[in-house]
Amino acid sequence: MHPFSVGTFFKHLSVSPPKPSVLKPISKSLVAVASAAPPGTSHFGALNSHQKQQVHVYIDSLLQWNQKMNLTAVREESEVMERHIEDSLAIIQPIRNSYVSRCGASSENLKIVDVGTGAGLPGLILAIACPDWKVTLLESLNKRCQFLEHVAGETGLSNVEVIRERAENLWQNQNFRESFDVAIARAVAEMRILAEYCLPLVRVGGLFVAAKGHDPQVPLLAISLNYTRNK
């Protein structure tokens, strides 16, 4: 199991969308947790039979589509389960805990945006495991969006929306700016850049969760959290 370090920003001030790379000293809160399961623990095993079937449909589709396009470097089903499925499922409880403790609200019926979702990780897996969450998958590449829409259709997920757009453009749309309870990004850019992309999408009182897997660098994470967006 490859551990995640999850950095969680609590958005408590209403701010204007940022100009690129304009940062100032901190005004957000942080929770950093390790979300890897103990050896022998299976988050997949806690899913119901229907959810497990949906995950298998996802894995089959991922491996098939991966033969004609670059979705993941992983080629074996067992490795997909370990590196992608279990890792994605492992961040659910930290997200719930952080949302309840930081936002003082229920972690049910959340509006989630997965920024730079790629192959739908972790967003599609979160949508399967948490059917009460409304998950928006944000991806800029058309072929990947086609894959995401295919999987959403094959798995029968009604709580998933696929949007083809870049994060730095989406927040300029009034329909999406500050409209999500939680924004999630997984290893798509440096922490500071992730914050600039994701924070404009999060409502006041919401969370930005940065999941950095495979040898998480806690000092770098801590340094990055000393900055937030300028007005």
PLM region spans:
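N-terminal auxiliary segments of SAM/dcSAM-dependent transferases
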Residues: M1-R83
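Residues at alpha-helix termini
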Residues: G45, M69, T155-S158, T228-K231
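Residue-level signal for inorganic ion chemistry
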Residues: L62, L126, K212
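Conserved hydrophobic residues forming the short capping helix/wall of the S-adenosyl-L-methionine
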Residues: N66, V151-A152, S224-Y227
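Conserved SAM/SAH cofactor-binding pocket of Class I
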Residues: L89-V188, I193-E196
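C-terminal substrate-binding/active-site "lid" region of AdoMet-derived donor-dependent transferases
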Residues: E196-K231
